[in-house]
């Protein structure tokens, strides 16, 4: 009998339920159904109440922050920064209010009015309507008050834009005189609306931005633009309000009274924490981001992997946080397992498979990272490997001339004599670290040979931070007056360039701080060289250190910068390179951490030598 027939037979012979049983079943079903309906209704009510509560909370938070900003916008506290240099025929009162959840690019609302209060109210009402309608949780609010405005035709604008490096035009643009379509500087640069190469506004990027922001795109670009500047204020997630700098060199980021020891420690902690978060399960890093459009950098460089390890160990030294240890170990293991090649039992190199290259600098920074790790953790775990890598460096050094060979291929065949001056300093720094690790004179002798070449070839001209690091390390063991003079010259003769540099140029700070440690060592040891009296300007040197410590904050992703990127939370509280599309890359962060770490370690001495007094005299 088929399965179907058996089932039919079973059904045919099944006992039919009574009327009472049917009624009971029906009653039970009704009760269950009613309970389900009630549960659904209750869930809907709860969700509604929760949603309404969240909406009320979001509105209350917005109103609190907005009121704090309103007080600033309507006050006269910064009247000296508001020149009133606004071209006739343009609105005198324009306020921009930016709101951001931290999860997406900020929304910006523009208000104009007969007075400042009316302009504020216009921007505020637009923003509040958005918060209500979208149930939007704005953790950051930023207010900008227009202080200057001038009309340029497109030819004049192109001429003006020609003078700026990418992302360094620090003015907003209105595309009509009534400011119906007005874009802040941070929006222009954050959404790539300015085409610096062709010195114009990119209509495609502009309209894409306007559409995504829910604003009307332009049918065509006008024949003239209103270029404007603002005075700004930032209210953060803790309802703290910061004045934003209006000077062009440091435009748009919060004013910091003094970049002191505690402030530097916080920068190092935050940025190193960012690096920790970039370590993947296999020990490699997320290499970097172009945050304007939240895009990963599709590349990897094992040399930068190695140098970044150094920053992770710095954070451990500062915090003693044991949770960092497995992350650091994982990142070192990745380097050791994937990028170390042996030439023989005595010689190893750091090898980059992608390019099939052995780079001198890579071997150098690998040694620095491993020795830093062993020193921080009181371990000799990587001693043998560090020595083998050091022997690899020696195969690339002509100790008679002090010159290095920079690049070998994967078969250990010479490929390129010179790649970058950085490699020389990195390798020499590593040799000095190996001497510290082993007390074997062969490392120090090799480092001396390289330093003699630095001096004879006048490496001062390269403004190289790795040379400064290597000089700082070797003068711990060698009291040669020529070494000290060269090290001081490496900073002094480049101070004008460093002091006046418009970009953050993070490696300059490392150069300065390494040189400061050398200077301090001279004073502590009572070492005097003629250059101290005839060339070295301590006041200018210390003033430059503070100037760079402060100016480099323009490369830090405070909320007021991050909020105009596509995914603010992903790059918050780390360092970036503005003139390369706000690039965030592990080595950029590492160099910033390196400079601020040394600043933190030496801050008390810097103050004792008069840094803050010299700063105030500038």
Summary of predicted features, one role per range:
Residues 247-261, 306-322, 365-379, 426-439, ...:
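Well-ordered alpha-helical scaffold segments within catalytic/enzyme domains
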Residues 124-185, 480-553:
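Active-site/pore-lining binding-face segments in mid-to-C-terminal subdomains
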Residues 1-57:
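Gram-positive cell-envelope targeting signals
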Residues 105, 109-266:
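Extended, non-transmembrane interaction/recognition domains
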Residues 272, 279-283, 291-342, 351-357, ...:
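Glycine- and small hydrophobic-enriched segments that form the cores of compact globular domains
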Residues 73, 217, 267-284, 326-346, ...:
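Long, well-ordered core segments of solenoidal/helical folds
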Residues 256, 291-306, 347-363, 379, ...:
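Solvent-exposed loop and edge beta-strand segments that line ligand/cofactor-binding
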Residues 300, 479-482, 500-618:
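CBM-like carbohydrate-recognition segments
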């Amino acid at each position: 009998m088929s399965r179907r027939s058996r089932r039919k037979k079973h059904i045919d012979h099944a006992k039919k339920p009574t009327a009472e049983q049917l009624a009971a079943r029906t009653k039970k079903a009704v009760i269950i159904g009613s309970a389900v309906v009630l549960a659904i209704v209750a869930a809907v009510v709860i969700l509604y109440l929760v949603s309404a509560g969240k909406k009320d909370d979001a509105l209350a938070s917005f109103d609190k922050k907005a009121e704090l900003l309103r007080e600033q916008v309507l006050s006269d506290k910064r009247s000296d920064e508001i020149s009133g240099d606004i071209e006739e025929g343009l609105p005198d009162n324009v306020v921009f209010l930016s709101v951001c959840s931290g999860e997406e690019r900020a929304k910006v609302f523009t208000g104009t009015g007969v007075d400042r209060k009316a302009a504020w109210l216009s921007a505020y009402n637009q923003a509040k309507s958005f918060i209500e309608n979208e149930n939007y949780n704005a953790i950051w609010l930023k207010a900008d008050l227009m202080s200057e405005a001038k009309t340029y035709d497109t030819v004049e604008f192109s001429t003006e834009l020609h003078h700026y490096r990418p992302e360094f035009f620090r003015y907003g643009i209105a595309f009509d005189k009534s400011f119906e379509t007005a874009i802040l500087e941070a929006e222009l640069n954050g959404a790539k609306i300015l085409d610096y190469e062709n010195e114009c506004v990119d209509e495609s990027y502009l309209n894409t931005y306007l559409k995504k922001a829910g604003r009307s795109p332009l049918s065509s670009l006008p024949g003239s633009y209103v270029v404007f500047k603002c005075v700004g204020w930032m209210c953060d997630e803790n309802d703290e309000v910061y004045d934003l700098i209006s000077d062009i060199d440091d435009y748009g980021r919060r004013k910091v009274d003094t970049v002191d020891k505690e402030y530097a420690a916080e920068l190092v902690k935050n940025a190193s924490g960012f690096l920790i978060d970039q370590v993947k399960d296999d020990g490699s890093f997320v290499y970097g981001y172009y945050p304007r459009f939240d895009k990963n950098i599709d590349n990897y460089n094992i040399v930068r992997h190695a140098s970044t390890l150094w920053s992770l160990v710095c954070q451990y030294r500062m915090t003693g946080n044991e949770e960092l240890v497995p992350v650091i170990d994982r990142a070192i293991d990745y380097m050791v397992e994937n990028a170390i090649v042996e030439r023989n039992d005595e010689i190893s190199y750091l090898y980059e498979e992608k390019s099939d290259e052995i780079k001198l600098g890579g071997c150098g920074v690998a040694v620095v990272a491993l020795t830093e790790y062993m020193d921080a953790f009181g371990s000799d775990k990587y001693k043998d490997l560090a020595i083998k890598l050091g022997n690899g460096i020696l195969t690339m050094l002509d100790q008679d001339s002090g010159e290095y060979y920079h690049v070998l291929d994967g078969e250990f065949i010479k490929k390129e004599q010179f790649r970058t001056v950085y490699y020389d300093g990195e390798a020499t720094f590593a040799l000095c670290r190996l001497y510290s690790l082993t007390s074997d004179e062969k490392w120090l002798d090799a480092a001396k040979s390289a330093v003699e070449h630095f001096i004879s070839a006048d490496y001062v001209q390269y403004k190289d931070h790795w040379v400064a690091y290597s000089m700082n390390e070797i003068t711990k063991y060698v009291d040669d007056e020529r070494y000290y003079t060269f090290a001081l010259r490496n900073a002094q003769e480049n101070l004008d360039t460093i002091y006046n540099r418009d970009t953050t140029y993070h490696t300059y700070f490392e150069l300065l701080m390494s040189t400061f440690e050398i200077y301090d060592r001279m004073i502590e040891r009572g070492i005097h060289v003629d250059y101290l009296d005839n060339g070295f300007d301590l006041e200018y040197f210390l003033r430059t250190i503070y100037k760079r410590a402060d100016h480099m904050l323009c490369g830090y992703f405070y909320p007021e910068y991050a909020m105009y990127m596509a995914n603010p939370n992903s790059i918050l509280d780390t360092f970036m390179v503005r003139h390369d599309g706000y690039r965030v890359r592990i080595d950029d962060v590492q160099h910033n951490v390196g400079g601020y770490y040394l600043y933190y370690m030496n801050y008390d001495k810097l103050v004792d030598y008069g840094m803050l007094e010299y700063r105030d005299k500038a």
